[in-house]
Structures are given as C-alpha cells and as structure tokens.
Amino acid sequence: MGIMAVLMLPLLLLGVSGLLFIYQEASRLWSKSAVQNKVVVITDALSGLGKECARVFNAGGARLVLCGKNWEGLESLYAALTSVADPSKTFTPKLVLLDLSDISCVEDVAKEVLDCYGCVDILINNASVKVKGPAHKISLELDKKIMDANYFGPITFTKVLLPNMISRRTGQIVLVNNIQAKFGIPFRTAYAASKHAVMGFFDCLRAEVEEYDVVVSTVSPTFIRSYQAYPEQRNWGSSICKFFCRKLTYGVHPVEVAEEVMRTVRRKKQEVFMANPVPKAAVFIRTFFPELFFAVVACGVKEKLSVPEEG
C-alpha cells in the first residue's frame, strides 16, 4: 500500500498541475471575453495604474476611452498600445483631455463620450490627488482641490453616465480607492477625507442601482507604488509604529492592481481589499479595538515629532 501511494503521488501532482494550468488559461481567456467590444472609460490613464489598466483592457479587446491631463502623454500611451496590439482583435483607443479637479469640464467630457459611443459599459474611476502635511498647515483651497479631484470629479462623471446604464439595465462602475478609506493616517487629513467620502458615495450607490443590474465595485489597495519604488534595505527599527508604517508604505505594483481590476470586472466583485497582513490587521484593530489603534498611531506621531530635523 505504501509503495502504491509513493507511485501515485507524482501522478497526483501532475494532475493537479494540469488542472491549475487549464484554470489559468480559461481565466485568461474569460478575462478577455468579458470586456471584448465593451466601451471602457479609464480616468487618469497616464498614471502607473492607468497605463497598466489600459494595457490589460486593450489586450482584452475593449473600446478604450483614455482620459488624462496631458495630450502628449496620451499620444505616447496611444503609440505604446497600438505598437503591440493586433489590429484585427483590438480597437483604436479614443483620447480625451480631462482634469477631474476642474469640475466645470467633467460633465461636458462625460457627455462627449456618451455622444461618441452611445453608451459606456465600464467606468474605471482611477484619478487621485494626494497631499501630505499637518492639518493646520493645509489651506482650505487645497482641501477643496483634493475633494474636487478625488470626490466631486468621479461622482460627477458617474452621475452623467448613470442614467444611460440604468436605462440599458447593464454596466459596471469601478472605483480604485485606497486603504485610507478604511482608517485615517496622520498628516493626510484632506486625502483620507476624500477617500472616506467617495467610498461612502459608492457604497450607497451600489445598493441603489442593484435592481437595474448595474454593478458598483471598489478596489482598495494599500498604496500603489511606482515602478522604481522598493523598500530600502535597512533596519526597520524596534518601534511597533515604525514597523507598521514601513509595511504600510510598501505597497502593491500597478500591474497587480490592474490585473485585479480586470478580475473584479470579470467576476463582478463588489469590494476588493488589496493589502499585506499588517494593514489588514490594522483595519481589524481599528474596527474592533479603536482605542488601541488610536494609541498606536498617536504614539507614532509623537515619536516622529521628537526626532530633530537634519540641517
């Protein structure tokens, strides 16, 4: 019996490997068919994540509408996509100048897209503006700019497209958010407030439009790092707060997030939280042991303020 088990083990492993390969290939093909011929709008397509989403959805045969602040950057992205695309399986992307912090033009741009295609099947709200500093040193003007870009811009774009989705009884809205929609981090008051606000809006919207078969999804990574950003090889220090902050800032790669956005669209997921164990634990502690969480975060602020500045 023991010899038979030993002989069967390689066959079992081979069978499992084969099934895993088939599943991965089927998932890849399913991902592409899920967006083929669909009109997909990506805001802030010039960011690292925006470019990767453009690459993934273009490969899947979507009719892309790429929105960005810089025309030269959009043309460069267009060239990069078309240079590797199969013309028989992909569509020519449409380029649109859009600054979500300029609310006066957002509605016009959204209407332009609808007039051009007649509908939008998938909207990926990706644009985000960040600011860091003590709350009392951040001007109200900057607070308003952050709210315009991260909250009012995305919801304005969404509200223009929503009636069309409801009347067609189909569509999906994906919000790429951030862990700071779950809890606040010191010196990021404006950014965290905008992320809390936009998460609240889309959580409410999800329930409102479910009866019309419109899907609302949120993808919240800890931090989308740049292509070159990696954690420094050094001693993290003994402080629990330092360890937490270092782990928190070591975020996920744009490629990972773009692939997760595609999976979210394909499976029509409602909420995805991308994080390593430490930030996930922080969310748990914030929810069930808030006083402990606040104490640890406050300790980190005091420790930072006690360190003398160089020079």
Curated annotation (Swiss-Prot):
Entry keywords, A to Z: Membrane, NAD, NADP, Oxidoreductase, Sarcoplasmic reticulum, Signal
PANTHER family: DEHYDROGENASE_REDUCTASE SDR FAMILY MEMBER 7C, PTHR44668
Organism of origin: Rattus norvegicus (Rat)
Cysteine disulfide partners in this protein: none
InterPro entries in the cross-refs: NAD(P)-bd_dom_sf, Sc_DH/Rdtase_CS, SDR_fam, SDR_family_member_7C
Location within or outside the cell: Sarcoplasmic reticulum membrane
Signal peptide: 1-18
Top-level EC class: oxidoreductase
Main location group: membrane
GO MF term set: all-trans-retinol dehydrogenase (NAD+) activity; oxidoreductase activity, acting on the CH-OH group of donors, NAD or NADP as acceptor
Known EC number: 1.1.1.105
Functional note: NADH-dependent oxidoreductase which catalyzes the oxidation of all-trans-retinol to all-trans-retinal. Plays a role in the regulation of cardiac and skeletal muscle metabolic functions. Maintains Ca(2+) intracellular homeostasis by repressing Ca(2+) release from the sarcoplasmic reticulum (SR) in myotubes, possibly through local alternations in NAD/NADH or retinol/retinal. Also plays a role in Ca(2+) homeostasis by controlling Ca(2+) overload in the cytosol and the SR in myotubes.
Name the UniProt record assigns to this protein: Dehydrogenase/reductase SDR family member 7C
GO cellular component, one term: longitudinal sarcoplasmic reticulum
